[in-house]
Amino acid sequence: MKYLIILAIFFNLSYETTNYFEEAGEYYRIDPKILYCIAKKESKFNPNAISRNSNGSVDIGVMQINSVHLKELKKYGFQKEHLFNPKINIYAGAWLLKRCFNKHGVSEDGITCYNGRIENNTYGYEVLKELKLVYEKEK
């Protein structure tokens, strides 16, 4: 937790936002530091980030939730606009990551799954490299 507070100050995140990583991690039984590293890679913690993909889909918010998931999220009462709320977005990201972990294990492939395709994709490796730095800085 101490590390998340230090990073929050460095990246100008609110304490409340860093708490969302802790809360979502606890709820989905995921290391919150993994969620934090994904958010850093995906949006540099920008809750208003929007990325347009070549396939026509859009990634939204802190965790860059892809618009292909909107149909399923609507079943739970969430609309696209809700994904600009950091808490909702971080929980949605944790939910998606948990599904990937259930399919591929808590592994590099599990993290890569969060980004979409697994073949020829270094996403998981890059997130794990960042995670290693996070843990080294905590020592």
Question: Which role does the model predict for each range below?
Answer:
Residues 3-13:
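Sec-dependent N-terminal signal peptides
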Residues 14-139:
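Catalytic glycan-binding domains that act on GlcNAc-containing polysaccharides
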